[in-house]
Amino acid sequence: MYPVITVPAFNDNYIWLIRHENHCLVVDPGDAEPVLERLAALDLQLDAILLTHHHHDHVGGVTALLGHFPHARLYGPKLDPMPAHHGQWLDDGDQINWHGLSLEVIHVPGHTHGHIAYYGHGMLFCGDTLFSAGCGRLFEGTPAQMHASLQRLAALPDDTLIYCAHEYTLSNLRFAYAVEPDNHAIQQRIGLISKLRQQGLPSLPSRLGDEREFNVFLRCEQDSVKFSAEKHALKCLENPEDTFTVLRSWKDVF
């Protein structure tokens, strides 16, 4: 087993620690301080840093962490500009192997050109591509790229656990409800996540099979989602990619 430890950072970021005995990997350490505190509290040795993309709230802690753990390896996307450190830059289909854990690299452009996700052992570390009940903004890529990236992630097994990088779930669900007000899965999820957040608990990880029921960005082929997008756009939409494009621009101003 590879327990995953949640490290909250900033206002709504999550940094993930993947643990094996007294060793660990860290995913998207935007801030070193909470990571160092957790490593010290648990007496863990940092073996490697995994980055999904180049935004500062995901890479800002790299220099300090490497200062404390100079032998830790650094991995990140080959097609994104990475921190000025020696690292192994990864592309689609590459693998990381660590204490029996094999993580496959999946190129998921959209949020950034080079954004990657790490998948293995039933876990998906997807940065700012797929969120619970939502998806990332398009800072560099196109709607077509993001839609294709989400479709690729949606093809993973139902029991895949999604470890994304932000606590956006409730706001995403409110948008989903605006799109599909008659979707009972969305209504039930709002109740569940509201209770978790009131207790100060994270809404993550989320199960991919459940996401297909309430994440409207994974439901662009559904008539109910298409109808709502057409009503918002005041035009007919020919395919799921067009529906996604409308949903993403709608969410940007929701």
From Swiss-Prot:
Q: What Gene3D superfamilies does this protein map onto?
A: Ribonuclease Z/Hydroxyacylglutathione hydrolase-like (3.60.15.10)
Cofactor annotation: Zn(2+)
One family from Pfam that matches here is HAGH_C
Positions contributing to Zn(2+) 2 binding = D57, H58, D128, H166
Q: Which InterPro entries match?
A: Clx_II_MBL (IPR035680), Glyoxalase_II_hydrolase (IPR050110), HAGH_C (IPR032282), Hydroxyacylglutathione_Hdrlase (IPR017782), Metallo-B-lactamas (IPR001279), RibonucZ/Hydroxyglut_hydro (IPR036866)
- Top-level taxonomic group: Bacteria
EC number annotated for this UniProt entry: 3.1.2.6
Question: Mind listing the GO biological process terms from this record?
Answer: methylglyoxal catabolic process to D-lactate via S-lactoyl-glutathione
Q: What does this protein's record comment on cofactor binding?
A: Binds 2 Zn(2+) ions per subunit.
Query: What is the main EC category here?
Result: hydrolase
Keywords tagged on the record: Hydrolase, Metal-binding, Zinc
The UniProt annotation places Zn(2+) 1 binding at H53, H55, H111, D128
Q: Which residues form a coiled coil?
A: none
Reactions it catalyzes: an S-(2-hydroxyacyl)glutathione + H2O = a 2-hydroxy carboxylate + glutathione + H(+)
A GO molecular-function descriptor? metal ion binding
Assembly and partners are described as:
Monomer.
Q: Which family does it belong to?
A: Belongs to the metallo-beta-lactamase superfamily. Glyoxalase II family.
The protein's job, in short, is: Thiolesterase that catalyzes the hydrolysis of S-D-lactoyl-glutathione to form glutathione and D-lactic acid.
Q: What's the protein called, per UniProt?
A: Hydroxyacylglutathione hydrolase
